[in-house]
A protein has these predicted regions:
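C-terminal beta-sandwich/jelly-roll accessory domains of carbohydrate-active enzymes
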Residues: 67-70, 94-167
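Aromatic/acidic polysaccharide-binding cleft in carbohydrate-active enzymes
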Residues: 1-78, 84-85
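Short, well-ordered beta-strand segments enriched in hydrophobic/aromatic residues
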Residues: 86-95
């Protein structure tokens, strides 16, 4: 989220290391794991993919109104507008283990009603990981959230990354 909010300064970023063989690796932040016949995308791969598919064209201000100092509650956010699709895209990450209530307000916009499309990456179950035998244990899931009076009132579960899209 910080990288996205500073897109006027940071023009490119890369993720390393990218690949790891399941029988010969040095550390575990790799994006793609493989053996001689198969490959599997890591949870980190899906985080990068979700950002890449929801870049938008303009960064817009986004703040979280919380009773604790910025970042101490484990919630992080960024927002963009995509002039090609007419969508506002808000990304929220909850790094804690507990669910947290989030109210996303779209101040200054025309009336938004209906539903926001969502994409959620749920990493709350520490026993799960994408493996060659279970490559889809943790993958992004599409959903929706109600928008009432230009506000999305929702709960973001612990260890979740959620993208909200409204027109």
């Amino acid at each position: 989220t910080t990288l996205e909010r500073n897109a006027d300064i940071v023009h490119m970023a890369t993720y390393a290391p990218l690949f790891a063989h399941v029988e010969g690796w040095q550390w575990r932040p790799d994006l793609i794991w493989f053996d001689n016949l198969r490959s599997v995308k890591s949870v980190s791969y899906y985080v990068q993919q979700m950002y890449a598919k929801n870049m938008g064209t303009n960064v817009v201000p986004a703040t979280l109104a919380t009773p604790t100092p910025k970042g101490e509650d484990g919630l992080f956010t960024s927002a963009v507008f995509d002039k090609n699709t007419g969508e506002y895209i808000v990304k929220v990450i909850n790094t804690t283990d507990k669910a947290q209530t989030v109210n996303i307000k779209f101040d200054g916009l025309k009336k938004i009603e209906g539903n926001a499309a969502t994409v959620t990456l749920d990493c709350s179950d520490y026993t799960l990981d994408n493996t060659l035998d279970h490559p889809n244990a943790i993958i992004p899931q599409d959903g929706w959230a109600a928008v009432e009076g230009n506000v999305i009132k929702t709960t973001v579960q612990g260890k979740n990354f959620v993208i909200f899209k409204v027109k």
